[in-house]
Amino acid sequence: MEAEALKFFIACVTAAGFGIAIAAFGCGIGQGLGLKAAAEGVARNPEASGKITVTMLIGLAMIESLCIYALVVALILIFASPMTATVTGLLTGAGH
């Protein structure tokens, strides 16, 4: 049982790590492309900078929320796992 709990916990931690890394990478790319497009739009039409800035900020907030959701899922995988208490006991030596 202890070995299975440890394997499950390692899988959860690995999945959480890869998940947040992929989410951060994707969000970074998306935000960079959005900022690039907004800067080009303001350069082409400076009079519309207010509307472009507001739209860009709303879009960036939406993109950032995706990364926050990935962080929440990663934290749930790590801390709300049913095997967390067992693995914590193993690591602190209380399991023996």
From Swiss-Prot:
Membrane topology: Multi-pass membrane protein
InterPro entries: ATP_synth_csu_bac/chlpt, ATP_synth_F0_csu, ATP_synth_F0_csu_DDCD_BS, ATPase_proteolipid_c-like_dom, F/V-ATP_Csub_sf
Keyword Ion transport: yes
GO molecular function list: lipid binding; proton-transporting ATP synthase activity, rotational mechanism
Primary location recorded for the protein, binned into one broad class: membrane
Transmembrane segments: 9-29, 58-78
Cellular component annotations (GO), alphabetically ordered: plasma membrane; proton-transporting ATP synthase complex; proton-transporting two-sector ATPase complex, proton-transporting domain
Domain of life: Bacteria
Subcellular location, record wording: Cell inner membrane
Keywords: ATP synthesis, Cell inner membrane, Cell membrane, CF(0), Hydrogen ion transport, Ion transport, Lipid-binding, Membrane, Transmembrane, Transmembrane helix, Transport
UniProt keyword annotation of Cell cycle present: no
Gene3D superfamilies: lithium bound rotor ring of v- atpase (1.20.120.610)
One protein family per Pfam: ATP-synt_C
PROSITE patterns: ATPASE_C
Site (Reversibly protonated during proton transport): 64
Function per UniProt: F(1)F(0) ATP synthase produces ATP from ADP in the presence of a proton or sodium gradient. F-type ATPases consist of two structural domains, F(1) containing the extramembraneous catalytic core and F(0) containing the membrane proton channel, linked together by a central stalk and a peripheral stalk. During catalysis, ATP synthesis in the catalytic domain of F(1) is coupled via a rotary mechanism of the central stalk subunits to proton translocation.
Assembly, per entry: F-type ATPases have 2 components, F(1) - the catalytic core - and F(0) - the membrane proton channel. F(1) has five subunits: alpha(3), beta(3), gamma(1), delta(1), epsilon(1). F(0) has three main subunits: a(1), b(2) and c(10-14). The alpha and beta chains form an alternating ring which encloses part of the gamma chain. F(1) is attached to F(0) by a central stalk formed by the gamma and epsilon chains, while a peripheral stalk is formed by the delta and b chains.
UniProt similarity note: Belongs to the ATPase C chain family.
Protein name in the entry: ATP synthase subunit c
Organism the protein comes from: Desulfosudis oleivorans (strain DSM 6200 / JCM 39069 / Hxd3)
